[in-house]
């Protein structure tokens, strides 16, 4: 793949799910599986469900903590079955299709994080990610099986990659450092602006960070915006 995307599982409970995810990854051309948790999750059941994707399990990387699993990544995407709304600006998700439309523009190492089967990702884990994705499902039963959720998201990314096989990206995507500097400049600008009420400043910072991460801006655009916040 042109872009490096890791699938990250946080404390998975069922070996069968891990094996099924390995199979799905191979179906759609993804190679790196990262697991936060114990190596014992990969057992005979996992290999049985993986079928011909054993090498994905053999090469899986294990981490003790969430922070370690995402530490070397440039862009991290959280997944959640619980949707945010207009009143919850920290949890405004995009759909897998919207993610696929954007993700091929990203340069660097990307991680897509999937939470625990029973209660998903914790809020503090989601807050450490750059983007939140949620799969539209029926309100009667919105939470999907873990391996099915992985399949939906990887399918959308793969089909978009196929449709855009010869896509040429002319502008360099803003690096992680570019974005962090832009956000820091904006935060400093907000802190110094006496016209903005104190109780709204933190909200402005949260919204701007989300906008920057959702927009996939170029390096040139990031530096142009920075000049406005001096």
UniProtKB/Swiss-Prot annotation:
Q: Which family does it belong to?
A: Belongs to the class IV-like SAM-binding methyltransferase superfamily. RNA methyltransferase TrmH family.
UniProt-listed Enzyme Commission number(s)? 2.1.1.-
GO BP annotation list: tRNA nucleoside ribose methylation
Instruction: Quote the subcellular location field of this record.
Output: Cytoplasm
Q: What is this protein called?
A: tRNA (cytidine-2'-O-)-methyltransferase TrmJ
Catalysed reactions, as listed in the record: cytidine(32) in tRNA + S-adenosyl-L-methionine = 2'-O-methylcytidine(32) in tRNA + S-adenosyl-L-homocysteine + H(+)
Give the keywords, sorted. Answer: Cytoplasm, Methyltransferase, S-adenosyl-L-methionine, Transferase, tRNA processing
Q: Which CDD domains match?
A: SpoU-like_TrmJ (cd18093)
Q: Spell out the subunit comment.
A: Homodimer.
Query: Is S-adenosyl-L-methionine there in the keyword field?
Result: yes
Q: What class of enzyme is it?
A: transferase
The positions annotated for binding S-adenosyl-L-methionine are 79-81, 115, 135, 142-144
Chief place where the protein resides: cytoplasm
In terms of superkingdom, the source organism counts as: Archaea
Give the protein's function.
Catalyzes the formation of 2'O-methylated cytidine (Cm32) at position 32 in tRNA.
- Gene Ontology terms: cellular component: cytosol
Single GO molecular function: RNA binding
Keyword match Transmembrane: no
